[in-house]
């Protein structure tokens, strides 16, 4: 395969009917909801991957329905704790819907097992690896390279330099030579040519705002689709967790869903919005944000595409 990444400001990737990228206001934001996450109440055994199929299907269908209504494409973020579990989950998601899916785990062995299974059964056109990052070892990368998976999240986490420059350097040149290669080159060596650039959001007070700022820098330099799992910011905010425990659950939900708006307003093309259970509230929030951006960008072009809830303003609206 040609392992050279494409380059061009405002790159638009198309995967299983999902368009991602472009200029602000051009395409609707892509939302990825996580299913089978740790502690998910539809799972009966996280090690073997036993779960309630009926409830899982309802959650997936709810997200797909919200995607159809708003025009915001969706991705199923499949998390599995073990090799056995993630293979079961991917098999199930592959059967019940036709949407792209993320292969996600805290275990490198599980991620590889998921990638290999997707390759074996012909699901690579829908599969997105999560993720290629500075901690990935050679065996994992070599195994990924043996598959036909061509899309991956590229995590810009830099533990030694959490600045915008540090994140950009991790992608470009391995943090100015601290690592043998930059993550973009590592990804290309694995056969990846569709990059989803994750700005690696950290807790408030530890660089959360820097990650949002990195969105602008990445779009300006490379133009690859960019986003993050920014919903992790509220979950790592000690004060908010305590406030939630004190009986203010609604406030937590507002901050959790609202965090996605921040990512979109800073030029993000995708958000990993957290539990798929929140699809019915995450999609309207992001769709509204997309409409704000599309209106703001209407004078500059390009024209908004596939934003089902967006109506272009008439000249009179500007008076």
Language-model features: where?
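Single conserved hydrophobic/aromatic residue that forms the stacking wall/gate
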Residues: 1-13, 310-319
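N-terminal amphipathic alpha-helix/helix-capping segment at the start of soluble metabolic enzymes
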Residues: 7, 11-43
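Active-site loops and adjacent core secondary-structure elements that bind or stabilize anionic groups
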Residues: 12, 272-273, 286-289, 294-309
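Solvent-exposed alpha-helices and their adjacent loops that cap or buttress functional pockets
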Residues: 21-24, 94-95, 119-123, 144-147, ...
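Active-site beta->alpha loop and helix N-cap motifs at the rims of alpha/beta catalytic domains
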Residues: 31-160
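Alpha-helix-loop-beta-strand connector modules within alpha/beta enzyme cores
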Residues: 88-100, 216-224, 295
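Catalytic alpha/beta core domains of metabolic enzymes, predominantly
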Residues: 147-286
């Amino acid at each position: 395969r040609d392992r050279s990444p494409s380059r061009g400001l405002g790159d638009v990737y198309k995967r299983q009917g999902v368009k991602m990228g472009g200029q602000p206001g051009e395409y609707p934001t892509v939302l990825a909801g996580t299913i089978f996450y740790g502690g998910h109440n539809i799972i009966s055994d996280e090690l073997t991957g036993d779960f309630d199929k009926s409830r899982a299907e309802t959650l997936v269908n709810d997200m797909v329905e919200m995607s159809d209504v708003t025009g915001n494409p969706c991705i199923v973020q499949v998390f599995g704790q073990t090799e056995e579990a993630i293979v079961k989950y991917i098999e199930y998601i592959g059967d019940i819907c036709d949407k792209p899916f993320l292969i996600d785990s805290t275990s490198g062995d599980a991620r590889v097992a998921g990638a290999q299974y997707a390759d074996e059964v012909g699901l690579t056109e829908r599969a997105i690896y999560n993720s290629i990052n500075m901690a990935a070892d050679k065996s994992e990368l070599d195994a990924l390279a043996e598959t036909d998976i061509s899309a991956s999240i590229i995590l810009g986490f830099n533990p030694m330099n959490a600045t915008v420059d540090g994140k950009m350097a991790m992608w470009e040149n391995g943090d100015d030579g601290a690592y043998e290669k930059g993550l973009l080159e590592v990804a290309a060596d694995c056969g990846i040519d569709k990059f989803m650039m994750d700005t690696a959001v950290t807790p408030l007070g530890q660089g959360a705002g820097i990650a949002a700022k990195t969105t602008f820098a990445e779009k300006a330099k490379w133009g690859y689709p960019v986003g993050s799992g920014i919903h992790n910011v509220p979950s790592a905010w000690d004060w908010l967790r305590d406030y939630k425990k004190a009986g203010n659950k609604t406030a937590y939900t507002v901050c959790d869903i609202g965090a996605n708006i921040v990512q979109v307003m800073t030029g993000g093309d995708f958000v990993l919005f957290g539990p798929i259970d929140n699809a019915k509230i995450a999609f309207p929030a992001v769709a509204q944000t997309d409409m704000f951006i599309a209106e703001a960008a209407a004078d500059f072009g390009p024209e908004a595409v596939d934003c089902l809830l967006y109506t272009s303003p008439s000249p009179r609206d500007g008076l």
